[in-house]
Amino acid sequence: LGSVLNGGGSWPNGKQSSVSDWVTLADDYFLASTDQTDGSSGIPLIWGTDAVHGHNNVIGATIFPHNIGLGATRDPDLIRRIGEITALEVAVTGIDWVFSPVAAVVRNDRWGRAYEGFSEDPQIVRSYMASMVRGLQGDKATDSLFSPSKVVATAKHFIGDGGTTDG
């Protein structure tokens, strides 16, 4: 086992999980994956979670507006700062990988997941994607790339997602 996906609706001890519940589970995953008593290699696994508008599976985490609302701000620096806050709140729970940002270019407002896209303009989506990734992972230019308060970002929903016909 090399990785664990914590999808939407998954919690360590039920829906009301605290930060300490998440940290305990992260510690348990780490200890189990590095245990070499059965002859395994002891390589730590990577744990990923959905964090599209904050670390929304954790009670008390900061929840940001959905991407469609953020897209209306026309403020890439705001998107970067949201990524920084999200990364910190995910990192302190022991998770090191997020399934974010969403790269969908919404072309049909009737699409059921239109709220997940930043814009119907590919240039805005591109700009916001870059800003969010810098916020989540850090920036090589500032020596913050993958510092302890950062997480690995994963662009998702990009090839044809958002380009639906009839909603």
Please place each PLM-identified region on the residue numbering.
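Glycoside hydrolase catalytic-domain context in secreted enzymes
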Residues: 1-167
